[in-house]
Amino acid sequence: MKIKNRIIALIALLCIVIGSLAFIGCKNGGNTKINEIDYVAQLSLNMDSETKKQKVTVYNYIDGDTTHFKLSEPIENTNILKARYLAINTPESTGKIEEYGKAASDFTHKKLQNAKEIYIESNDSNWNKDSTGVRFLVWVWYNTESDSTFRNLNLEILQNGLAVASSIGGTRYASICQNALDQAKQLKLKIYSGTPDPDYFYGEAIECSLRDLRLNIEYFNGKKVAFEANVWRSISGTLYCEDYDEKTDRWYGMQIYNNNNGISSEAKAFLTMGNRVRIVGTVSYWETGATYQVSGLEYDPRPEPGTEKNYIKLIKTGVEPNFLEIDAAEFTGKQNVELELDEDVKKFDYAELALYTSVKATGLKVKKVYTTTNPDSSSVGAMTLTCEKDGKTIIVRTGVWRDDNMNTVTEDDLNDKTIDIQGVVEYYEGNYQIKAELYSDLLRCE
């Protein structure tokens, strides 16, 4: 009898232990439902606090934790504020592409795009900058047509599992931010889910030609690609490359965003004009320019056997830009080029196919000149030339030109003149134009 009682007691004890373990397992990712709290709804914007505040509108969407805002009143002599969101760090969606970077960027974009009003708030009584000395550290608040209550976007991004903490402890909303972050981890949201990001490409680089990339750009968006091309120009961290395709008898181009992060000096040396390079990077949509780019380049001088195809590589040197001379009517035409693609015929704008390639235009009559004078712009002194040839209008955008004597070239030097120019085909505010960045791109002016 005693033995039987002991057995029953042991079984009961075992059940208790197993039940306890099961309960613990549920609390750490099992089936126990966590009481989800909307921390954003608990935080309100105090317009009477000592912090700086200003109503703004969006100037440029950058990524999940960076936005450029147009100010209602200047701050430190600027009307455009480059905002870095306080307390958060979202995955990258420009430059190096990271998991859930696109999701974070899209989340911020959608919230601000649908906002009725947007306010920025400083962390204390001053407008403070981050370590770059360029971006201001702010809290971003917004409301909507359907809800006049302001919501803190920084906190909302954390609450939705789209960011990691960034110096939360030193901020005015530290406690509630930490609570939102802890909850996102408990709920295993987005970057804390442990599941693959559906918008992130995990496979090896897709081998393609530059022609295939350009003609199927939407398909390749978000994917890692590998192709060969001639680097023919480098401007402020952006490379322009081009390649000739015999099948269609055309040149195709691409812009490469290269902020040099993670790229060695050896790689930087061959990512220069005049080199043919194997490019390996991720295709992404560049919100500011409303076009596509390749970014996230990686280089390894001594790659492991079998991994060579995942890195950029120098193919050869001494390659010259093409500078194909364009016809004004052809360049400005719509749906005027037919290409046979996989037994299907598609129509394209000539300029669309020429995007990011090197071109030359001769005999352009300068009809109007606009000079950038906004001190907030990085291109003060650059000009937009409205030109005509054969009854067609071609727009030329210059850099800040200085002649051989280092004198700045102005509109007085160009108005009513006939010019020959060379440059890159770009897309700006719904139109294709020629970007002649260098003074040497002005081939003739008389």
Question: Which residues does each PLM region occupy?
Answer:
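Second-shell loop/turn segments in exported
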Residues: E92-E99, D106, S122-N123, V138, ...
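Soluble non-cytosolic domains of exported or imported proteins
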Residues: G95-D106, K111-N114, D147-S148, T171-N179, ...
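Bacterial signal peptide processing site
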Residues: K27-G29
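Bacterial N-terminal signal peptides that target proteins for export
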Residues: K2-I11
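OB-fold nucleic-acid-binding modules
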Residues: K33-M47, G170, K185-E446
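C-terminal motif of bacterial Sec signal peptides marking the signal peptidase cleavage site
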Residues: A22-G25
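Bacterial N-terminal signal peptides
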Residues: I11-S20
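Electropositive
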Residues: T32-L155
